[in-house]
Amino acid sequence: MIKLIVGLGNPGAEYTATRHNAGFWLVDQLAREAGATLRDERRFHGFYAKARLFGEEVHLLEPQTYMNRSGQAVVALAHFFKILPTEILVAHDELDLPPGAAKLKLGSGSGGHNGLKDISAHLSSQQYWRLRIGIGHPRDLIPESARAGAKPDVANFVLKPPRKDEQDLIDAAIERALAVMPTAIKGETERAMMQLHRNGA
């Protein structure tokens, strides 16, 4: 069963529409669907809501610590409510998936994502669920003939808003991810994963 859903992003209006905040977008949508309001909760270092989703009580969290310190918020909430790593789902932007893709998986490394890296360090575990929301990679914007030796600026890319066509694809992927949330929250995470991946996400 999933008891805590964390959306990763950076705090502040200047980052709201940027690719790195895709995790926030998903949690914002979940809060809206539950009729819950995310409020600043200092003890959890983020915006927090306790929501009733699909018949289950679920904690929603958007760390306000900046991305590379997300673990501080996650571990504070997980310890307070005695939530195990395997009961946590972290939604985050994923450079290695194109816009329009979303994948669910348990465990493994951070893939260079500083938010995941910090969460794993604070939890002393990588065994939590990740919802990877594809944002594409800046190398994809470089013509193939010019890619050899090119060094795409990843930091600049994730801190910029997606193009309109990319945003539409990302929004569609988030909708597909939301459609499998009832299954995931009830603990049928493997089934949710199969549904999400089968639906072309």
UniProtKB/Swiss-Prot annotation:
Positions marked as site (Discriminates between blocked and unblocked aminoacyl-tRNA): N10
Binding, tRNA: Y15, Y66, N68, N114
InterPro entries: Pept_tRNA_hydro, Pept_tRNA_hydro_CS, Pept_tRNA_hydro_sf
Active site: H20
Subcellular localization: Cytoplasm
Any one GO molecular-function label of the UniProt entry: tRNA binding
Marked site positions, Stabilizes the basic form of H active site to accept a proton: D93
Keyword entries, A-Z: Cytoplasm, Hydrolase, RNA-binding, tRNA-binding
HAMAP family registered for this protein in UniProt: Pept_tRNA_hydro_bact (MF_00083)
Name of the protein in its database record: Peptidyl-tRNA hydrolase
Species per Swiss-Prot/TrEMBL record: Burkholderia mallei (strain ATCC 23344)
